């Protein structure tokens, strides 16, 4: 299918017209009596223009999915609070040559020990609209029930339910069942993440095996289990033992794709060069740990027999961004080079690996142009755009 694109400058120009006319019509509608009668034709014309423009604006932005290698995932994560930014999501998909979008469904959780959870229905409806628009454009969708703990003030890795049995019962019957009923049974969803960085629950092997069976009964797409990134150190064998235990969980062999929230602490330098980053992927320099990230990814693949996928990944455009990539505010010194060198090194090392399924950029769809996780240079944009290009 041929994809149609609008020139960015023209798009920006039309969008400015759209916003201006929208403000005019909004003000016009506030008048009463004679003023409304006098402006009736103008209001009607502007209303038609806005509807037509909205159709053109969203209808012509399409993913050029034919340029991405078959079987690979080039994705972007949308945050739970930005699923309504449909136009920006689509623009980022085009700009970065993505073929997939990770759409979160907000799961409201009162506190870190809670076993009670509920899907936020208002956010879910926005997510469904985004899913519909993505599927219209042949963009694959991965659905992720995303833990939103204490109104988003606590990260999902902190979730430690007080009763593991109650947790799994509610995760299956309240959360996943809602997603089956309202999303996966109605839309062609490429993948479903059944877990997102549940470090305190991953030990429950029997429960996870049962959950996967439960999911398979109602969903025929790709099942993903997402684990959190890990540390090892050459001077402490206990880290290695935990890693070996992690990758040998039996339930990992039952999913289709093993996903990693990938924030490996690679380089302790403020501004490492491309060559330094590349070398550090085989022996990390932060605290001289010597972690061989590339080798461990291969170990994970061999242990599970499954493709490995970076379900959340980026390099913040900050000095020390490769020391603590999970922290967008690791430094207040902006650095496009750190982001570029990180993306280049990861691409050059992982793109040739047949077991590596792909990646999802954390994040897309945001209008915060200064955020460290935005892609801040044309050079970094080109690296991402070209990854897995046919």
What are these regions (language model features)?
Residues 63-93:
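Boundary/entry segment of secreted carbohydrate-active catalytic domains
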Residues 90, 103-150, 202-225, 281-288, ...:
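Aromatic-lined substrate-binding rim segments of carbohydrate-active enzymes
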Residues 321-331, 336-345, 349-390:
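Aromatic-rich peripheral "rim/lid" segments of glycoside hydrolase catalytic domains that contact
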Residues 53-65:
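Sec-dependent signal peptide cleavage junction
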């Amino acid at each position: 299918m041929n994809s149609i694109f609008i020139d960015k400058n023209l798009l920006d120009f039309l969008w400015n017209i759209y916003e201006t006319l929208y403000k005019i019509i909004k003000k016009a509608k506030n008048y009463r009596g004679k003023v409304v009668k006098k402006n009736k034709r103008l209001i009607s014309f502007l209303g038609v223009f806005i509807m037509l423009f909205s159709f053109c604006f969203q209808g012509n932005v399409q993913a050029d999915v034919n340029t991405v290698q078959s079987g690979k995932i080039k994705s972007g994560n949308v945050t739970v609070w930005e699923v309504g930014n449909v136009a920006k999501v689509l623009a980022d998909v085009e700009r970065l040559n993505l073929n997939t979008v990770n759409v979160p469904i907000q799961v409201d959780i009162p506190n870190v020990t809670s076993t009670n959870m509920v899907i936020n229905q208002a956010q879910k409806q926005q997510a469904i609209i985004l899913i519909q628009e993505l599927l219209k454009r042949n963009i694959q969708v991965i659905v992720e029930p995303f833990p939103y703990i204490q109104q988003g003030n606590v990260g999902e890795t902190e979730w430690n339910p007080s009763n593991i049995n109650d947790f799994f019962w509610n995760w299956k019957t309240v959360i996943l069942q809602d997603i089956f009923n309202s999303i996966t049974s109605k839309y062609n969803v490429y993948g479903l993440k059944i877990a997102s960085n549940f470090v305190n629950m991953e030990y429950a092997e029997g429960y996870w095996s049962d959950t996967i069976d439960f999911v398979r009964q109602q969903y025929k797409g790709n099942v993903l289990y997402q684990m959190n990134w890990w540390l090892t150190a050459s001077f402490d064998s206990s880290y290695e033992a935990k890693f070996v235990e992690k990758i040998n969980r039996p339930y990992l062999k039952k999913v289709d794709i093993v996903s990693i929230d990938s924030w490996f602490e690679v380089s302790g330098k403020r501004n490492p060069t491309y060559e330094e980053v590349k070398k550090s992927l085989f022996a990390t320099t932060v605290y001289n740990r010597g972690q061989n990230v590339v080798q461990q990814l291969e170990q994970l693949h061999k242990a599970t027999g499954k493709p490995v996928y970076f379900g959340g990944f980026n390099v913040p455009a900050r000095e020390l961004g490769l020391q603590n990539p999970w922290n967008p505010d690791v430094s207040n010194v902006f650095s496009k080079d750190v982001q570029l060198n990180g993306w280049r090194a990861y691409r050059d090392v992982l793109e040739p690996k047949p077991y590596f399924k792909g990646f999802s950029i954390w994040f897309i769809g945001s209008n915060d142009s200064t955020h460290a996780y935005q892609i801040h240079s044309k050079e970094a944009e080109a690296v991402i755009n070209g990854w897995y290009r046919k």
